[in-house]
Amino acid sequence: MDQFQRNGNKHRSWQQFFLYPLFFREDLYAIAHDHHLDRSSSSEPTEILVSNFFSFLTVKRSIRRIRKQKNSISLFGNCSPNKFLGCNKNFYSKLILEGLTVVLEVSFAMRSKHFIEGMDGWNSIQSIHCIFPLMEDKLPHSNYISDIRVPYSIHPEILVRIFRRWIRDAPSLHLLRSILHEWKNSFSRENLQKALVTQRENTRFSLFLWNSYVYEFESFLVPFVKRFSHSQSLLYGSFPDRTHFDKKIKHIVIFPRKISTKRIWLLKDPFMHYVRYGERSLIALKGTHLQVKKCRYHLFHFWQCYFHLWFQPYRVCSLELSKTYSSFLGYFLHVKMKPLVVRAKMLDDLFITDLITIELNPIAPIRSILFFLAKEKFCDISGRPISKLSWTSLSDDDILDRFDRIWINLFYYYSGSINQDGLYHIKYILLLSCAKTLACKHKSTIRVVREELGSELFTKSFSKEREFISSSFSKTRSQRERIWNSDISQINPLANFWQKIQNKQIEN
């Protein structure tokens, strides 16, 4: 596969136009088997037992069956090769799908790389860590923010149409069409979104379909945003001091090219800020109310004509930044108008200018966290701590570790919020709930638990090592700056949890 990827530029036609022979390479399914084995190593033991009896002879027979199939392909039916081994009926279907996905991913990666190289100024950072800089970003040129939810009622023919843009091999398209229809029918009446986004165990094939679908949406945003651009290209000379160079544009004198030996650069004002997680997207734009409505109309029109999908009006919400706040991934993004006085002196004249900058301040939703703790029986509706009765059968160390893990997850996720006092109120609730749980287990009181454990209740549970790390960083940094503890293993579950809650609130 590495050699296949390295020779991409030389044999690009084979990758884009003749993918069908690659679908029947046995080594690709060996790669898919290794990937499936690594991913399922921490799952059920039966899945690992099944993988030990994996047979490439069965894969060859499945490939031969696909090749000789005339009308339709039954990959998701009863395909258990050996009932004596108790093999999962979908095991070989998953491996075949992952083998097909390996070929599609390589070709898709080359196509996306070629597209990004052709688009100037398009930097796509595919990580959740790029969301946090947006929450601290300054929006000097934006006055509207649009909350977009990507539609997920995807028909298989729409996905086939997307593949036709970069796959010209007719047998490959017919094979993909048959697999997609069979794959959708395997979920009966469930929405395809549950298979793509909210499936309990996302397969490699489902993730590839969702990424391809969203890629088409984001690739449309590049020319779409350039059309509604309000910034003009400006020329400026290079400076030894590059700090806040965009504020010095008005004071630059452009010399003729015959005299100037400086390098001429091209600059565009940062008028747009875009971030996406899952099906939620936030776009900060500059323009009037009429222009934002036109932008919203063109987005509706594009989605209905290109994807043949009905775009519900509630999926796009455009609000003015100075009058409201938005919620994203469990944060409330509060907009703060910050006035700034600038004095500029030119010869004997003194000019005073008032500038207003827009800043986003992330706020932790304390009420929502209290509601979640009350739902999980850590406290009541009013926020009064109660004992966790379902944990009284555990050992003391397990109880302390579980409460410690809950607080660490919340502290990591909301470490950059401006309302840290509310987080310590949550910590106080968890601490008393932990003490009451231990007291209920030993049939004693909270005072007795504190006397027996002493400082161990506060050191072993709710350890302050991570808070000490943040405080040591804060000594060397400005007090206005915030520190984000970007632990990807703790961020993703909470982000998905708040995403589901907000989607239910919008739909209801």
From Swiss-Prot:
What high-level taxonomic lineage is stated for the organism? Eukaryota, Viridiplantae, Streptophyta, Embryophyta, Tracheophyta
| Function summary | Usually encoded in the trnK tRNA gene intron. Probably assists in splicing its own and other chloroplast group II introns.
What GO MF terms are annotated?
Answer: RNA binding
Q: Which PANTHER family match?
A: MATURASE K
Q: What's the encoding gene here?
A: matK
Identify this protein by name.
Maturase K
Chief subcellular location equals plastid
Q: List GO BP terms, alphabetically.
A: mRNA processing; RNA splicing; tRNA processing
What subcellular compartments does it reside in? Plastid, Chloroplast
Keyword match DNA repair: no
Q: Which Pfam families match?
A: Intron_maturas2, MatK_N
Q: GO cellular-component terms in the record? A: chloroplast
Q: Which domain of life is it from?
A: Eukaryota
HAMAP family associated with the record? MatK
**Coiled coil where?**
none
Concerning its family, UniProt says: Belongs to the intron maturase 2 family. MatK subfamily.
Q: Which InterPro entries match?
A: Domain_X, Maturase_MatK, Maturase_MatK_N
Q: Which UniProt keywords apply?
A: Chloroplast, mRNA processing, Plastid, RNA-binding, tRNA processing
Which cysteines in this chain are paired by disulphide bridges?
none
Instruction: State the organism named in the record.
Output: Cunninghamia lanceolata
